[in-house]
Amino acid sequence: KTMERYEAFVEYLARKVGRDPVCLRRPTYAETNELVRYGRCEVALVCVCPFLRGERDFGMQALAVPQIRDAVTTHSVVVAPRSSEATSLLDLRGKRFASADIVSYSGWIVPALWLREQKEDPDGFFGEHILAGSHDRSVQAVLMGHADGAGVLSLVYDQMAAEDPTILERTKTVFKSEAFGVPPVVVHPALDGKLKEQLRAALVGMHKDPEGAKVLAALGIQRFVVPEATLFDSARALAKRWEAR
């Protein structure tokens, strides 16, 4: 269902810039970055950490960011079954933990760094680290009893709960981070300048177009905006602390 919505997003964007739509999905964040780095795709949606790494490694640029509930920031949250005795991330010691990817900023790096700053070793803290492949699959792992906790992007968790309110009855939040910039739509810095501006214009104008507004509504997005240069500063600072280990 999620992929169908993003396919509709890709199809809309492609029509706006006169291109054939091809929706590529890779199993890891690193592989998605490689698509952008080597020009195998024109535009991509990436997690915060892959964006920061792409920015550092080859100048990846944030073209636009989604605005959701009047905000362009989000959080990392760790969710657990409602029936769990856990009330904090520390209570998940020795338990099964799910995240989208090993380089997922909200799914792994933020909670893992918090554990390290509590003098814990995140690599040995959990009994099992499950790489679910996406945030919604991480939440599903908790719902299905395959994981005792999951680190996820709060935007995804909130959207899932909005569509299925029973999720809030079956899960609870045991950790919530400080706010950081929402994952962006990115391009390679060497992408043709005219195409880059066409893509940006299509994104920031989507909410004004009835067809575009329908696509956005299905994704739980109000509109796309051009990000301020400082939007990802807090994430950059946290990533530096993580990489300084």
Task: Describe each PLM feature range.
Residues 1-52:
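Extracytoplasmic small-molecule ligand-binding "clamshell" domains
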Residues 23-34, 122-140, 179-181:
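Short helix-initiation/N-cap motifs at beta->coil->alpha
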Residues 7-19, 107-131, 159-166, 237-242:
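Ligand-binding cleft/hinge of the Venus flytrap
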Residues 48-57, 111-117, 141-144, 148-168:
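A ligand-binding cleft/hinge motif common to bilobed small-molecule-binding domains
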Residues 60-71, 125-128, 161-179:
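Short beta-strand->loop
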Residues 80-101, 122-124:
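Flexible hinge/capping segments at coil-to-helix
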Residues 30-44, 57-58, 90, 134-155:
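Short helices/loops that flank or line small-molecule/ion binding pockets
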Residues 1-8, 180-182, 186-245:
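An extracytoplasmic/periplasmic, membrane-proximal ligand-sensing/linker region
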